[in-house]
From Swiss-Prot:
Family designation: Belongs to the apolipoprotein C1 family.
Gene designation: APOC1
Protein name, as recorded: Apolipoprotein C-I
Keyword Transmembrane: no
Gene3D superfamilies attached to this UniProt entry: Apolipoprotein C-I
Domain of life, source organism: Eukaryota
Function: Inhibitor of lipoprotein binding to the low density lipoprotein (LDL) receptor, LDL receptor-related protein, and very low density lipoprotein (VLDL) receptor. Associates with high density lipoproteins (HDL) and the triacylglycerol-rich lipoproteins in the plasma and makes up about 10% of the protein of the VLDL and 2% of that of HDL. Appears to interfere directly with fatty acid uptake and is also the major plasma inhibitor of cholesteryl ester transfer protein (CETP). Binds free fatty acids and reduces their intracellular esterification.
Organism the protein comes from: Cynopterus brachyotis (Lesser short-nosed fruit bat)
Length: 88
């Protein structure tokens, strides 16, 4: 029973594949592609700009930079004290 049902489906799929793309699905010509490139690049640039700005704002609003700065200051102070006690 499955073989009887799958053969017509296979034939229809094979016919669709061999038919090729429909006219609406055909590739656009080169001139329209070249004309659309600047618009797409501008859209891409603005999208990247917004994502970058959002990321920078999140970093500035977080306390990560302050914690990192404090950690480095503490570590530097400990190393400095260790050098002073070792070499004095």
């Amino acid at each position: 029973m499955r073989l009887i049902l799958s053969l017509p489906v296979l034939a229809v799929v094979l016919a669709m594949v061999l038919e090729g793309p429909a006219p609406a699905q055909a590739a656009p010509d080169m001139s329209s592609t070249l004309e659309s490139i600047p618009g797409k690049l501008k859209e891409f640039g603005s999208t990247v700009k917004e994502k970058f700005r959002t990321a920078i704002d999140q970093i500035q609003k977080s306390d990560f930079p302050e914690k990192t700065r404090n950690w480095f200051s503490d570590v530097f102070q400990k190393v400095k004290e260790k050098f002073e006690t070792t070499f004095s």
